[in-house]
Design a protein with these regions (language model features):
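N-terminal catalytic or cofactor-binding beta/alpha core of small enzyme domains
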Residues: 1-271
Length: 271
């Protein structure tokens, strides 16, 4: 209800799991749900995973990359605590198989601790549902740019010769219905300029876009389009965690420009 009569709202969720800076006068939102690095103080002493290994699996810097976008939501908690892009029954990494064969916990969290993690997970989706309802009530359709980043070396190790800078996953959406905005988004991504790097774009190459965020929102209403967009970690040394600020800046400016143009095109065509 607190969103219904407002155009601009920003803050942090009461449980602290995510931040938001929303412009509800436009039908498009950019998210970086895996940007977070924080782990609750009650969980940190139980963990076996090193901070370096945890950082490698997080989408480091994606909150900075979306910072110039007009309307955005970003995660603050580490996906080693709970993963917003998995269904709730798989969101807590209790075994190495659930976290790229990395053992997250030395000692298992209590049931109460796990409940608190899942409460933060649920709070994110309740908030997202409220945002979606406001946008659908106002515009009749809305679009979410679901921004992630991925480790290049892992794809190379799998035999991928040239992992793309941008990968759009469309296996979780009605590809035929959204043909025009999908094609336009791929085109906009290809126009983003990055220092000393050829911008390459692919669809369903390294990822198919079947994460929980896309699948859940897509099931809520047929007039919601989610575009799961992976950026390769060209903007950092994925082994040391050192970020290259010039590339972050180029991605931030390029993505904001692309989203404004594409979002306005979506608004004129579908709302």
């Amino acid at each position: 209800a607190f969103l219904c009569n407002q155009d601009r709202i920003s803050g942090t969720d009461s449980l602290g799991g995510f931040g938001y800076d929303l412009d509800l006068s436009v039908p498009f939102v950019t998210t970086a749900i895996h940007a977070g690095h924080r782990v609750r103080s009650e969980l940190a002493p139980l963990m076996a995973i090193s901070e370096k290994d945890r950082l490698a699996e997080e989408d480091t810097g994606t909150d900075r990359i979306i910072r110039a976008c007009p309307s955005r939501i970003w995660g603050l908690d580490s996906r080693a605590e709970y993963d917003l892009n998995r269904p709730p029954e798989l969101a807590l990494p209790m075994t190495p198989e659930m976290f790229w064969d990395i053992r997250v916990y030395e000692s298992s969290p209590t049931d109460a601790m796990n409940r608190r993690s899942l409460e933060k997970y649920a709070a994110f989706y309740r908030f997202s549902a409220t945002v979606v309802k406001v946008l659908l009530d106002r515009f009749g359709a809305c679009i979410f740019y679901d921004i992630h980043s991925y480790n290049i070396q892992r794809q190379v190790d799998k035999g991928h010769r040239a992992p793309p800078v941008f990968n759009l996953g469309t296996r979780g959406i009605d590809r035929a219905r959204w043909e025009k905005p999908v094609a336009a988004w791929l085109d906009h991504l290809g126009q983003i300029k990055i220092p000393n790097r050829l911008t390459t774009v692919a669809e369903n190459d390294v990822f198919g876009g079947m994460g929980e965020f896309c699948c859940r929102l897509t099931q809520w209403d047929p007039n919601i389009l989610v575009l799961p967009t992976e950026v390769s970690k060209i903007y950092m040394d994925e082994h040391s965690g050192v970020v290259h600020n010039s590339k972050i800046l180029a991605l931030k400016n390029g993505l904001a420009k692309a989203i404004r143009a594409h979002g306005q095109l979506f608004q004129s065509s579908y709302t």
